[in-house]
Amino acid sequence: MIRVVATGTFDILHPGHLYYLEESRNLGDELSVIVARDANVKHKPRPFLPEDQRLRMIRALKPVDHALLGDLHDMFRPIAEIRPDIITLGFNQHFDEEHLRQKLRERGLDADVVRIPGYPGSLASSSKIIERILNTRGPPDPTGSHGEE
């Protein structure tokens, strides 16, 4: 059995997330997803949705066999427990593949690291969705326009 692990924040779940998880699942027989803890999200703005809600939504997705919250102190602990054959990264995740492979090997983990390409649609990231919401549904400008397309 080929075990795959996907990781992410998964804030404001969107088609790009689903694409990432579907493509990750296609690489193996079992997909486990590690959802970032609120306290550990430091490389971008804090999530809008609390970690328990993000975890619940990920668990409900068809491609996902198992989902869990990441460890508060050691991001490699859940990976070591799962012992995946493959770890996938999203197109915009900040990890360097070779550095991650090295860190895994230091812990006795021999998982391949695969970067999944971006979703081909226009709303492939939470930041793009937020930007579009603000541009199309934000407060009206002084001229009376609502910024709608």
Swiss-Prot record:
Write out the residues that bind ATP.
9-10, 14-17, 92, 119
Q: Which domain of life is it from?
A: Archaea
Disulfide bond entries: none
Record GO biological process:
FAD biosynthetic process; FMN metabolic process
Q: What class of enzyme is it?
A: transferase
Catalytic reaction(s) noted: FMN + ATP + H(+) = FAD + diphosphate
What Enzyme Commission number(s) does the record list for this chain? 2.7.7.2
The answer to whether keyword Transferase applies is: yes
Question: What are the protein's UniProt keywords?
Answer: ATP-binding, FAD, Flavoprotein, FMN, Nucleotide-binding, Nucleotidyltransferase, Transferase
Question: Which Pfam family is one of this chain's hits?
Answer: CTP_transf_like
**Single GO MF descriptor:** FMN adenylyltransferase activity
Cofactor field: a divalent metal cation
Pathway assignment = Cofactor biosynthesis; FAD biosynthesis; FAD from FMN: step 1/1
- Cross-referenced InterPro entries, in alphabetical order? Archaeal_FAD_synthase, Cyt_trans-like, FAD_synth_RibL, Rossmann-like_a/b/a_fold
PANTHER family attached here? FAD SYNTHASE (PTHR43793:SF1)
Sequence similarity: Belongs to the archaeal FAD synthase family.
Q: What the protein does?
A: Catalyzes the transfer of the AMP portion of ATP to flavin mononucleotide (FMN) to produce flavin adenine dinucleotide (FAD) coenzyme.
Q: How does it assemble?
A: Homodimer.
Q: What is this protein called?
A: FAD synthase
Q: What is the lineage of its organism?
A: Archaea, Methanobacteriati, Methanobacteriota, Stenosarchaea group, Methanomicrobia
